[in-house]
């Protein structure tokens, strides 16, 4: 009865499995159930299988024996032997009751307490978890299979070609008997490439009679994919690369000592493109470009470097790092000395100074004055209503008062020679004689001069009378000039 129920259980499990996936341990367990023959004392635990797929059909029979067997059926298959039953020892195994709905009941503890729901929600192990997709790679980098050259849309083409060429050369040299024919080597390189590199090897007519076929393919890749004319003029291309490396090493600068690793890496990569005999000069140039510790490191390198270490940039970089660590340790000591109390110096040695004035800096203490806040009074003055506050005031109509200077004037009149008024305000301006004299003086270009002397001053002028008619006209002119002066 147990075997028939087990067979139906396995068939039902595979039917309900559907698109789900099993782990390796679950798959091995199901294979054992299908292939191996079960002994009487063998115990198989099916609790690791998914409970949703493991559904057991219970066969209902009319006999009392079948009902009791199906109601108390255990997934741990096996019966104790007669020897074990005689001894009274019973095997301990986990009992799992099967429900009609197909779910398994959680095994009870020894004390009878039911386990919490925490075990049901327990995180699955790595074996039980299923990854529908592969883990994501670093964005921007195209993953290629091991040993296959694929340089389509790659930025580091030269590095990939060099690594691939080294691998092909190693395969050919370690298996010389298998790769004596150039056709075999080309076939190997064709199967070890993909993309545009494979199309180049397949569609190119190679010279199989002379030269190394591997070197021909690599030079062609340098020409086609890197733009370096290695096929026609390999020596000139290498000389050009050396000149560019020398120019870059000359232009390199290190302004911040924290970028020492990046600077060393760039300098070293370009230095190894030049000749080995020129390495000592480039190493001295490298040390002179390093700030703060470059001079001391250069002195140490000249004294300590000997033999092959003269050509080693790594030895120079090691000296630089040692000097840098010394400076860092010194800076840490200086920070600690700031916190050191000088009063403790008398503990080690007695003072040798008696009556000497100690030089100390004057301490300046800045007093912090608290800002005095004025007492806030929540008092608001009542606003008065102003009718014309936002309007232009009206202009007052009426005659404006003329400016009238007060007090006596301190000027002197030209006509009467009296102080206190101008000539146009003189009451004696109607006198024709003085006006005639002033008119004649103006014609001669004379200007009146005010003298500080008191009293009446007289002005004399010499006149020449030619005809009487002229004098009469001059008198009439004098009267007109007086009128003009009055108008002025």
From Swiss-Prot:
UniProt keyword list: Capsid protein, Host nucleus, Metal-binding, T=7 icosahedral capsid protein, Viral penetration into host nucleus, Virion, Virus entry into host cell, Zinc, Zinc-finger
Compositional bias, Acidic residues, is annotated for: 80-93, 465-488
Q: Where is this motif: Nuclear localization signal?
A: 121-124
In residue numbers, the zinc fingers (CCHC-type) are: 411-428
Among the GO biological process terms of this entry, one is: viral penetration into host nucleus
Please classify the protein's predominant subcellular localization into one broad category.
virion
- Spell out the subcellular localization from the entry: Virion; Host nucleus
Highest taxon above the source species: Viruses
Q: Which terms in the Gene Ontology molecular function aspect does this entry carry?
A: structural molecule activity; zinc ion binding
GO CC annotations? host cell; host cell nucleus; T=7 icosahedral viral capsid
List the residue ranges of the region (Disordered): 79-142, 464-488
Regions of compositional bias (Basic and acidic residues) in chain numbering:
94-130
UniProt key word Protein transport: no
Q: What does this protein do?
A: Self assembles to form an icosahedral capsid, about 50 nm in diameter, nm, composed of 420 subunits of the viral capsid protein. The capsid encapsulates the genomic dsDNA. Following virus entry into host cell, provides nuclear import of the viral genome. Virus particles do not enter the nucleus, but dock at the nuclear membrane through the interaction with host importins.
What is known about its subunit structure?
Interacts (via nuclear localization signal) with host importin alpha.
Similarity section: Belongs to the caulimoviridae capsid protein family.
This protein's name: Capsid protein
């Amino acid at each position: 009865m147990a075997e028939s129920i087990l067979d139906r259980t396995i068939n039902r499990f595979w039917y309900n499995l559907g698109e789900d996936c099993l782990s390796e341990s679950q798959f091995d367990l199901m294979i054992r159930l299908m292939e191996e023959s079960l002994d009487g004392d063998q115990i198989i635990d099916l609790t690791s299988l998914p409970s949703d797929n493991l559904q057991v059909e219970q066969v209902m029979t009319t006999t009392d024996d079948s009902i009791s067997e199906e109601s108390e059926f255990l997934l741990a298959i096996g019966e104790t032997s007669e020897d074990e039953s005689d001894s009274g020892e019973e095997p301990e195994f986990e009992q799992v009751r099967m429900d009609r709905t197909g779910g398994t009941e959680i095994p009870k503890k020894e004390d009878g307490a039911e386990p919490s729901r925490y075990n049901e929600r327990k995180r699955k192990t790595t074996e039980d978890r299923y990854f529908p997709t592969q883990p994501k790679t670093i964005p921007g980098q195209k993953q290629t299979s091991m040993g296959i050259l694929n340089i389509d849309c790659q930025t580091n083409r030269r590095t990939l070609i060099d690594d691939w060429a080294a691998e092909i050369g190693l395969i050919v040299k370690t298996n010389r008997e298998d790769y004596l024919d150039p056709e075999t080597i080309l076939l190997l390189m064709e199967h070890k490439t993909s993309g545009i590199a494979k199309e180049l090897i397949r569609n190119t007519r190679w010279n199989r009679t002379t030269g190394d076929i591997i070197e021909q393919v690599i030079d062609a890749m340098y020409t086609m994919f890197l733009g370096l004319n290695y096929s026609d003029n390999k020596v000139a291309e290498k000389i050009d690369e050396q000149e560019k490396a020398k120019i870059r090493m000359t232009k390199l600068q290190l302004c911040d000592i924290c970028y020492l690793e990046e600077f060393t890496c760039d300098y070293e990569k370009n230095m190894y493109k030049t000749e080995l005999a020129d390495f000592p000069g480039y190493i001295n140039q490298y040390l002179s470009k390093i700030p703060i510790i470059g001079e001391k490191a250069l002195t140490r390198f000249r004294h300590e470097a000997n033999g092959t270490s003269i050509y080693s940039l790594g030895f120079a970089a090691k000296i630089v790092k040692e000097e840098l660590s010394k400076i860092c340790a010194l800076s840490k000591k200086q920070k600690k000395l700031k916190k050191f109390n000088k009063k403790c110096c008398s503990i080690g040695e007695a003072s040798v100074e008696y009556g000497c004035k100690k030089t100390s800096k004057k301490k300046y203490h800045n007093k912090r004055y608290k800002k005095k806040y004025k007492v806030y009074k929540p008092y608001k003055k009542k606003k008065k209503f102003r009718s014309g506050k936002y309007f232009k005031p009206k202009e007052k109509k009426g005659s404006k008062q003329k400016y009238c200077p007060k007090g006596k004037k301190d000027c002197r009149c030209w006509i009467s020679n009296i102080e206190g008024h101008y000539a146009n305000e003189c009451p004696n301006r109607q006198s024709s004689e003085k006006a005639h004299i002033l008119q004649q003086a103006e014609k001669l270009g004379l200007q009146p001069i005010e003298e500080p002397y008191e009293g009446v001053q007289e002005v004399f002028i010499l006149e020449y009378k030619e005809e009487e008619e002229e004098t009469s006209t001059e008198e009439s002119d004098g009267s007109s000039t007086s009128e003009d002066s009055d108008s002025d």
